[in-house]
């Protein structure tokens, strides 16, 4: 999921979906776009959507309940991957095996995604999902 008001996220989410579907076709990934930050917060907080792509400043605001999310409260999230100034966030209780599969896919395709950090750069990010770290280290799926 991305949001209209966090402008670069929706076009980039379409690139992510296309790349993921090439590596994990059974995922049947497709982009989703919320109309505003309130809707992002609602869908993510209620676990109707498990992944969200936000600019780093908005990702931090979602985690802290600040900035555009100050009226809605903080949300517990983990980082899955980073692309330039954007972070792909995941629900902490999203199945570990799914997080591992996504992280492993990004490990394989990061060079095809504009601005994507390398797995080595991702491994030192704060708040990284533990299963993503396992995938980047080459440790088998949990």
Residue ranges and their predicted role:
Residues 1-14:
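Extracytoplasmic "Venus flytrap"
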Residues 2-3, 80-98:
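A bilobed periplasmic-binding-protein/Venus flytrap-type ligand-binding module shared by bacterial periplasmic
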Residues 25-42, 123, 127-128:
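Short helix-initiation/N-cap motifs at beta->coil->alpha
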Residues 50-71:
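A ligand-binding cleft/hinge motif common to bilobed small-molecule-binding domains
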Residues 66-82:
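Short beta-strand->loop
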Residues 111-142:
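An extracytoplasmic/periplasmic, membrane-proximal ligand-sensing/linker region
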């Amino acid at each position: 999921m991305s949001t209209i008001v966090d402008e670069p996220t929706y076009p980039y989410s379409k690139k992510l979906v296309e790349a993921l579907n090439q590596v994990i076709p059974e995922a049947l990934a497709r982009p989703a776009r919320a109309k505003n930050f309130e809707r992002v917060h609602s869908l993510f907080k209620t676990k109707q959507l498990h992944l969200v792509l936000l600019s780093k400043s908005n990702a931090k605001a979602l985690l802290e309940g600040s900035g555009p999310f100050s009226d809605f409260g903080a949300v517990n999230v983990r980082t899955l991957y980073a692309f330039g100034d954007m972070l792909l966030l995941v629900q902490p209780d999203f199945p570990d095996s799914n997080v591992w599969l996504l992280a492993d896919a990004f490990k394989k395709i990061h060079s095809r995604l504009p601005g994507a950090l390398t797995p080595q750069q991702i491994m030192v990010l704060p708040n990284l999902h533990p299963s993503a770290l396992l995938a980047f280290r080459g440790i088998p799926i949990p």
